[in-house]
Amino acid sequence: MKMMASRKSLWVLLFIVIFWISFTVFRNPVKLWAVFKLPASFNQWDLIMKSSCPKVPLNPSVSPTETELRIREILEKLNKQIPPRPFAHLNNTTSATHSIATILNPQDTYCVGDQLDILVEARDHLRNRKGYGGDFLRARMSSPALKAGASGKVTDFNNGTYLVSFTLFWEGQVSLSILLMHPSEGVSALWRARNQGYDRIIFSGHFVSGASQVHTDCALVLNSSVELCQYLDAQDQEAFYCVKPPNVPCAAITHMHSKNKDISYLSQQERSLFERSNIAVEIMGKSNVISVSKCNKAVPVKKKCKFGMASAIPTGHVWKNTWNPASCSLAPIKMKDCLRGKLVHLMGDSTMRQWMEYFKSKINTLRPVDLHETGRLQHQLAVDLDEKINIQWQKHGFPLIGSLVYSVKEIENTARIIDRIGGEKNTVIVFSLGQHFRPFPIDVFIRRALSVHRALQRLLLRSPDTLVVLKTENTRELNNDMERFSDFHGYTQYLALKNIFQDLRVGVIDAWDMTVAYGTNDVHPPEEVVRSEINIFLNYIC
């Protein structure tokens, strides 16, 4: 009898366990793997098959988490700066030609170190004064013969007037420029359109299973009723989706490329604002050259730039094609001596890969290590065994835009890479996010930045001596594809990134301000910009 009772108890217990497993799988398949600590990932992404996909990226199913609340908070701040500005006709939008720029307290000659202020009064194409702000302006002073340049600070009074302030860093003939990049009505349209859809870029996933090769559509969001592969970073609740090929497992994905989709969330009238003739139009007019002299002023002695120093606005200026910070001085540092004994992790997009290529070209003892990957986005490693220098570059996770095919076998989010780094005083991390996120709603970018922020918090807790450097996004080409790639999208990301990382001990290289000062409109800045970025980096770590 006791044996029979024991068997009954065992069967009851077994039934309860089976029921619990079935219920857990039904409610949350990822949680089951976490409970048993079983590997359920492919390249750090959990693979889950779904018959449909939500219309927005995956969020935790519980009540709003700290991440969701933080995203909401940042979005609310940005929304306040970019209110809706509907317009009935192009004539009612801001006109660079009819707007008025007035130099305050004009002088025949100015002195180095002075501040020059310009009041801008925005007017529409009918010459009417604008009653609200929000125009996207870019201010720059330059002396082409001296290969000198600096950005100007723009203050928006939200009533149709702006104060543009220039710090006069050098002597000579200086040209002043205030560009109307987009009128406030265009800014409002771009902001609305950006946050409206995830499908301006479509990705093609390449699956290989045996002798068969299949291509299917992939995206951050796929509005499809067919079965999908979900590549989920369960820790940060970030997902990427592909249509599941028939009879091919989700884990068989090997490569990807992307293409622009013929879709727009702008009206025909709004699109007229982004014709090339309406982008980056000069406000200053012809009377834009001033004369600056030394005036026998003493040049203030600045301390050497070092990690953690606060920066001014603007952050510096270009002189003879070399960057000069406003609040500190850059010491000449021998690159090889500085990097001796250091492990340098470069993470991000191709603007960080430019750093890798610069290091390899300037340190002739660095030897590339073949990691048996292919393509422009392959993980790169270069070492100098004698000097114990180790530099590596790794791309960030999805989204990665590129018409060329790239491997996704080893792709993972930057946060997961950081989580694997032990860190110590000779370990340096440099990361950058931005360009590949512009065509998608900004919550995608904010979520990724927050995941990197949390990973860095964990790293600095376990290894506070690790040095972390953030290189901000830079400006890019002024083409006709403003809905996807406008610098306005980059600027909002730049603002969000500075907000997110302000509480961490992170050195900042302000590539945005630098590329405005250099006057480059190139997603891949020229070598003199990369050299200046790396010079700041070397001063931070040595």
Curated annotation (Swiss-Prot):
Alphabetic keyword roster: Glycoprotein, Secreted, Signal
Species whose genome carries this gene: Rattus norvegicus
Residues carrying a glycan: 91-92, 159, 223
Subcellular location(s) per record: Secreted
Domain of life: Eukaryota
Lineage, uppermost ranks: Eukaryota, Metazoa, Chordata, Craniata, Vertebrata
Pfam families with a match to the protein in the record: Neurexophilin, NXPE4_C
Family: Belongs to the NXPE family.
Gene Ontology cellular-component terms listed: extracellular region
Primary gene name: Nxpe4
Protein name, UniProt field: NXPE family member 4
Keyword Secreted carried by entry: yes
